UniProtKB/Swiss-Prot annotation:
Organism of origin: Echis ocellatus
Primary site of residence: secreted
Entry protein name: Disintegrin EO5B
Biological role stated in the UniProt entry: Poor inhibitor of platelet aggregation. When it dimerizes with EO4A, it inhibits the adhesion of cells expressing the RGD-dependent integrin alpha-5/beta-1 (ITGA5/ITGB1) to immobilized fibronectin. When it dimerizes with EO5A, it inhibits the adhesion of the alpha-4/beta-1 (ITGA4/ITGB1) integrin to VCAM-1. When it dimerizes either with EO4A or EO5A, the inhibition on alpha-IIb/beta-3 (ITGA2B/ITGB3) is low.
Domain annotation Disintegrin: ranges: 1-65
Length: 66
């Protein structure tokens, strides 16, 4: 069983100097840049973009209500 390369095995938190462990806006232990598409549009929808400060893929604020 190998440890995740971004995770401190003792604390289960990102290693020093790393931003994240996993998520749609995390790659190679770093947050993806602001404006990186994290969810492509389907139909009349609009793309969702990473914020650059979190691993979440926030919903595009200009989308209509579900």
């Amino acid at each position: 069983n190998s440890a995740h390369p971004c995770c401190d095995p003792v604390t289960c938190q990102p290693k020093k100097g790393e931003h994240c462990i996993s998520g749609p806006c995390c790659r190679n232990c770093k947050f993806l840049n602001s404006g990186t598409v994290c969810k492509r549009a389907v139909g009349d929808d609009m793309d969702d973009y990473c914020s650059g400060i979190t691993t979440d893929c926030p919903r595009n604020p200009y989308k209509g209500k579900d």
